[in-house]
Amino acid sequence: MNGIEIFIDESGDFGAYEAHCPYYVVTMVFHESADSLYDKLEGLEYSLDVLGLAEHCIHSNPAIRGEDEYFGLPLSLRRKVLLNLMAFIHNADFRFKCFFVKKCEAGDETALFAALKDVIDPFVSANFKRLSAYSTIKVAYDKGQRQISRLITQTLEERFDNVQVVKILPIHSRLSQVADLCCTIKRIAQRLSDVGSLNKPELYFFGTAKNFRRNWLKSLMRSEWK
């Protein structure tokens, strides 16, 4: 079987718990190497160009909140940016998986690392045969946090003999933005489940919790690794 690429991104840090950032999230985006991304990427770039945002680097949370480079941009434009990225996910047939840890339940860096390993290990074990069938498993990570590099070693490199950790290439920048959108939508869904409501910027962007679940979360979940 052809190879598979796994792009890994993270949200959060290994510092102390803070109420505004209650979760640490590791996101894996999967793409079979045999399927070329270039024509799909061209479609995304064209869509952004039409919106007047050529070569724009998409940041999902600021787009939803209307912050940073999205401050003052019309709501309709911000929605179109994320909808175009969502369409790219479906067109490229990506699969993703998000792994959550509540930082309030992990007292320190060691406990947080162990908690992340505890949620990733069962997934890898359950999919061991499926992943082993690929000729190569190429893992792309920007090595932004040494703990995640160590996690990759312990959960993937030490368990498979066909893992190659590769450098981040320019084509991976859009995959990073895919991982960011997956993480953002799933994080909002997790908090919605925990507290029962969206915050004010999210309500303005999505309209209602029901609309968020039906038109955004449900759409994204079509691409979750199963």
Predicted regions and their residues:
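Phosphate-ester processing/binding pockets and catalytic centers
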Residues: 1-226
